[in-house]
Amino acid sequence: MDYEFLRDITGVVKVRLSMGHEALGHWFNEEVKGNLALLDEVEAAARDVKGSERQWQKTGHEYTLWLDGEEVMVRANQLEFSGDEMEEGMSYYDEESLSLCGVEDFLQVVQAYRDFLAQYG
């Protein structure tokens, strides 16, 4: 999973992730927005569920993050509809609306984000 951090013309830090992980970048950009307390909460939850069958979720304004001991999923809240409601030819999986990755990979991105903010924030 490749990622990069950018500062836009207004000084806001933006996160971009590789294809298939775009929703994770959107989660950082829409939900985190430099809120290190939210990252603290997510990291603590990752430690709590590690090695267990438990799951944890954090619902935001635009995206919801789920995690268990092995995997992290970020999904756009707008995807909360049943298959019957989908238009013909539409797929539930939209690369920019749903991302899955391993917990360790996710935590590496979180740490890199923190490091970027500390250096350039």
UniProtKB/Swiss-Prot annotation:
It comes from the Bacteria. Coiled coil: none annotated. InterPro entries: UPF0231. Belongs to the UPF0231 family. This is UPF0231 protein ESA_03214.
